[in-house]
Amino acid sequence: MALSKIDAANFLTGTIPQGNVANASLGAVTALPAAIPTGKVLQVVTGVTYTTTTSTSATYADTSLTASITPSATSSKILIITDQFMRKDQNNTYIGYKLFRDSTELNYIGDLIAYTQNSDSDANGIGTTYLDTPSSTSSITYKTQFATLSGGTITIQADASSGNERGRGTMTLMEIAGW
């Protein structure tokens, strides 16, 4: 059996003759054909809240974090990214966290544990990333809700390290061209 040696350093060198390329150079390509979906971002909306919400209940309540967007096409998708902080007041406190489009529940994150080795207050980040297909060109409002699933007290938009009730919650909505 014959062995061949391939010089990998020079294997992929060279040029394509200009006559074989439709444009003068690949750098001159400015657009893809319409049949190729690009998934480009059409608009970005951000919602911010500093409002503190506290609960000791297993009944879900709004966190005060909302953002609204009006998609430009029914084929668009909406990428939702939320980022909030919560504080619990005792060890082994479980939290439930939900994302809604108007009144429709989209995403549920349940049994998140806010755990420390002692019963001291502890702050943790909480959030979600979700790709929605609303199939609408009407205004849409997204919001988050939370509940305490195991007793104890949960405070959203809380900063335990400074001992105050301030914190920032953000929601970013990105309309992505449909594909």
What residues fall within each predicted segment?
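Terminal beta-strand-rich extracellular "head" domains
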Residues: 48, 52-54, 59, 70-179
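Short, solvent-exposed loop/turn segments enriched in Ser/Thr/Gly
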Residues: 61-63
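Extended, low-complexity regulatory regions
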Residues: 65-67
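Glycine-rich, low-complexity segments
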Residues: 1-52, 178
